[in-house]
């Protein structure tokens, strides 16, 4: 799987720090899925998270408490 460019990723968020937080949160939720290994065999969760953010499949909300 080809990684999305940094320019595309940064166009989806307000800063690179928000991007890292959102990707980390999504990667953790992917890892918690018991079927992750079956559905995404050979893919790394952080790579999938960046891909979902670039394609607009993962929506998050930046709040005072963190990313939701």
Curated annotation (Swiss-Prot):
InterPro entries, alphabetized: DNA-dir_RNA_pol_omega, Pol_omega/Rpo6/RPB6, RPB6/omega-like_sf
GO annotations of cellular component type: DNA-directed RNA polymerase complex
GO biological process: one example: DNA-templated transcription
Any one Gene Ontology molecular-function term assigned to this protein's record: DNA-directed RNA polymerase activity
Purpose: Promotes RNA polymerase assembly. Latches the N- and C-terminal regions of the beta' subunit thereby facilitating its interaction with the beta and alpha subunits.
Record's keyword terms, sorted: DNA-directed RNA polymerase, Nucleotidyltransferase, Transcription, Transferase
Protein family according to the UniProt entry: Belongs to the RNA polymerase subunit omega family.
NCBIfam families attached to this UniProt entry: rpoZ
Keyword Transferase: yes
PANTHER family: DNA-DIRECTED RNA POLYMERASE SUBUNIT OMEGA (PTHR34476:SF1)
Subunit-level organization: The RNAP catalytic core consists of 2 alpha, 1 beta, 1 beta' and 1 omega subunit. When a sigma factor is associated with the core the holoenzyme is formed, which can initiate transcription.
EC number(s) on file: 2.7.7.6
Reaction catalysis annotation: RNA(n) + a ribonucleoside 5'-triphosphate = RNA(n+1) + diphosphate
Gene giving rise to this polypeptide: rpoZ
SUPFAM superfamilies in UniProt: RPB6/omega subunit-like (SSF63562)
Name the UniProt record assigns to this protein: DNA-directed RNA polymerase subunit omega
Organism in which the protein naturally occurs: Desulfitobacterium hafniense (strain Y51)
Listed Pfam families: RNA_pol_Rpb6
Superkingdom assignment: Bacteria
